[in-house]
Amino acid sequence: MARAYRLGEDLGTGAKCVKFLINLASTPSMAVVPTAVELCIQAAVDDPVGEARWQSWFDQWLLELQSAGAVELTLRLTDDAEIRRLNARFRGVDAPTDVLSFEFEADDTQALIAEEPLYLGDIVVSVPTATRQAREFGHTLEVELAWLAVHGLLHLLGWDHPDEQSWRAMVTQQARLLKGVNVVYDWPSVYPVG
């Protein structure tokens, strides 16, 4: 499939890309809706979660979000230097952040919709920032990475939080999705609204 990654040359330097296919059609609850998720994990830093856990999480999240059809996305685990560079380049903020999402943009939307798998975009997570936040918020790094990954996934699917109401709706959805993979995140006391 020909596509122009939003991050293009930014992804791939020194990173191993591990792809695996999640066949959601084999899941009993989705037997009627054939769905597959191709997840590409690029780890520029050590991956504290592991491929099997990422696979399980994205599998369950997209099942719960009732994603139909085949989709593909990239998860990039990186450091503060790289995410700071991306944040400055794409958001004009010269500082590291925890997670960035880059929805796939296509000139020909109809051609994109006809392709399978449908490429959703890229999620980039800073593991050092996630480590600091996990320590600050009093939970494990795995919990923080799950929170950030599902936040990025929701952005790829069109969710946003420009105001308090949309923020609350989005973090409520994140908490629900995390509960589905047995990850407990006490967001009301951890993240401020906004």
Swiss-Prot record:
Co-factor binding details: Binds 1 zinc ion.
Cited Pfam families: YbeY
GO cellular component: cytoplasm
Subcellular compartments: Cytoplasm
One annotated GO biological process: rRNA processing
Chain sites annotated for binding Zn(2+): 151, 155, 161
SUPFAM superfamilies: Metalloproteases ('zincins'), catalytic domain (SSF55486)
EC number(s) recorded for this UniProt protein: 3.1.-.-
PANTHER family per record: ENDORIBONUCLEASE YBEY, CHLOROPLASTIC
Family indicated by similarity: Belongs to the endoribonuclease YbeY family.
Name of protein: Endoribonuclease YbeY
